[in-house]
């Protein structure tokens, strides 16, 4: 029987603690993990980058989620009673549909070498994470691999290599601990045509897996109805469980320049641009965020055939 998972990505937890971050619940300062638990969060998503440092050893930031940092966060949240969704990016920094850059150590590898490197890195990392006592309850093999991974060898439409690389990670996970469920994750959760095309190609070539993961950002990915329709179709077409691995809705249009310590040339502007806000069905307010979240949870909880009531909601703070 499917269960409904509520999750939060806390990959920057320790970095923010080192920066002095504080968290509040109705105006009262509290520990972030206590807040999450009291609001029924049960799973913490943690990304893993291969080598998030420059050639001179400077950290890239954004959590600096190498294996040591990921284990440290994973142990902390596991000790607090949470499960961990371990998210392999197979890159030294952010991997998403716009960039899937090979790790520096793999930059000259051909497809055969990449396949082997994925297997070894995945298996070795997972063993160390588990040996440290991290409660891994799910694994994500690649991050938003809509356009492939490990470019250029794994760039869409080279589905043969895409399937090779993902399948290598899947085999490594199964070899270490076969009972941990595995997810393949794409972005653009409202785009049914894209999901059908991608998974039709993969199913012809790749290793079996357990969950289809989706990202859904209303500014880019269509309406909630489009998300629901796509999830229903994925459940019927492939018989997989479904997880919304990333979702976000802001609550303010305030320009945060006054809070940043950046030069004007380094700023990216508003958290959410006005032209994007105009595309969504909810106002960018505290109540609008609450209404969106309630409607989102209600829709993903009622996907057909008992495949959809599983949702990892990555409620990103903006």
Which residue stretches match the model-derived regions?
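Boundary/entry segment of secreted carbohydrate-active catalytic domains
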Residues: 1-28
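Conserved, mostly hydrophobic/aromatic
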Residues: 8, 87, 139, 212, ...
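Surface-exposed, active-site-proximal loop segments in enzymatic domains
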Residues: 17-22, 50-68, 92-115, 145-156, ...
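Short, acidic/polar
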Residues: 21-36, 122-125, 193-202
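Aromatic-lined substrate-binding rim segments of carbohydrate-active enzymes
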Residues: 31-39, 45-93, 159-176, 231, ...
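Glycoside hydrolase catalytic-domain groove-lining segments
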Residues: 32, 181, 202-275, 297, ...
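Active-site cleft segment of glycoside hydrolase catalytic domains centered on the general acid/base Glu
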Residues: 67-68, 96-179, 183-199, 207, ...
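Conserved small/polar residues in nucleotide/adenosyl-binding loops
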Residues: 313-318
């Amino acid at each position: 029987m499917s269960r409904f998972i509520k999750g939060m990505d806390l990959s920057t937890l320790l970095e923010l603690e080192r920066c002095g971050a504080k968290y509040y619940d109705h105006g009262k300062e509290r520990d972030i993990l206590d807040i999450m638990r009291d609001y029924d969060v049960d799973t913490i998503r943690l990304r893993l980058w291969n080598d998030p440092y420059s050639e001179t050893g400077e950290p890239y930031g954004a959590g600096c989620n190498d294996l040591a940092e990921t284990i440290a966060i994973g142990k902390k949240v596991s000790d607090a009673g949470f499960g961990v969704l371990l998210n392999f990016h197979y890159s030294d920094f952010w991997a998403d549909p716009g960039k899937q850059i090979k790790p520096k150590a793999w930059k000259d590898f051909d497809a055969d070498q990449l396949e082997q490197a994925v297997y070894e890195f995945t298996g070795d990392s997972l063993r160390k994470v588990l040996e440290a006592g991290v409660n891994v309850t799910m694994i994500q093999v690649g991050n938003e691999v809509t356009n492939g991974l490990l470019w250029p060898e794994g760039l869409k439409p080279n589905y043969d290599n895409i399937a090779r690389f993902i399948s290598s990670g899947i085999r490594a996970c199964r070899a270490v601990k076969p009972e941990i469920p595995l997810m393949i994750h794409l972005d653009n959760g409202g785009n049914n045509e894209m999901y059908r095309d991608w998974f039709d190609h993969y199913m012809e070539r790749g290793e079996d897996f357990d969950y289809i993961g989706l990202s859904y950002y209303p500014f880019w990915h269509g309406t909630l109805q489009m998300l629901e329709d796509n999830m229903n179709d994925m459940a019927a077409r492939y018989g997989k469980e479904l997880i919304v691995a990333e979702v976000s809705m802001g609550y303010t249009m305030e320009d945060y320049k006054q809070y940043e310590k950046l030069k004007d040339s380094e700023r990216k502007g508003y958290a959410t641009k006005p032209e994007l806000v105009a595309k969504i069905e909810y106002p960018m307010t505290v109540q609008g965020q609450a209404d969106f979240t309630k409607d989102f949870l209600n829709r993903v909880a009622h996907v057909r055939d008992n495949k959809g009531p599983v949702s990892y909601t990555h409620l990103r703070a903006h």
